[in-house]
Amino acid sequence: MSKKISVSANSDVKKRILRVVDRTLQTHSMVQYGDAVLMGVSGGPDSVALVHILRALAPKYGLKLAIAHLNHGLRQNASDSDQAFVTTLAEKLQLPLYVDKQDVRLYQKNRHLSVEEAARQVRYRFYLRSASENGYNKIALGHHADDNAEQVLMAMLRGSGPLGLAGIPPVRPDHIIRPLINLRHSELLDYLAYQNLDYVEDSSNRDLQFLRNKIRSRLIPELQAEYNPKCVESLNRTAAILFAEEKWIDDRILPIYEEAVVLDDPVRLGLSLDRLKQEPIAAQRRLIRKAL
């Protein structure tokens, strides 16, 4: 079911949001003029905002836009309603639409994954396949600063290293981009409200069996109330610093990696143990991770 929010929004909201996203696109070289961008859209507020924001910026960059929606089939009728909403949105905006329905539960069972991870893998495979088959060279997703803060906290709780603590990458090697990464979720809601735009709500976002939802609804509010009202901004700042440093280190690891590779064919990759032993343990970890 779609929801329309109504608040008193400042007339500058749209311009400010577009300015932030435009700057993000340029800072991270997310798009080049004439790119074909496939937007992953669930129907929720973040992805709906992504569609309208990129559509507003498309003329400046000569972008060819399309929408991709995966029906996970996890919420029965609600999943079908989400698909219907996204279909209507694409028709209204006259954008090409690519839709698929997958059995995420079966994928989860066969690979012994959590539901959340199984859904993510199936969704990304669908996006990458749809982009490749239909001529789109970029895939845009609606992750924002709150998502990034949650990701950093999840990585911290898992005991991740610097790469995990670097959060959600604004740009991935497989051409996935996140134009909204410098915006708060509340800012996206303001943007939708200002333009009186509909979206759907996913009830699973309130299910506290998922760690991310616990972090969003319990841990972050506690951190904001008791320790740092701007903890989301602080976590994003830490992630940005680590992301930049990781990239710098990775660039310098590459020549060592190329020296260490002794076997590289479509099904196998081998590293020289003797060459690895010449490097400190931190470099060894990075080299092995790069090979994987």
Predicted regions and their residues:
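Generic N-terminal leader/processing signal
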Residues: 1-2, 277
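Core alpha/beta nucleotide-donor-binding catalytic domains of modification enzymes
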Residues: 2-41, 45-221
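ATP/NTP-dependent adenylation/nucleotidyl-transfer catalytic domains that generate, transfer
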Residues: 210-292
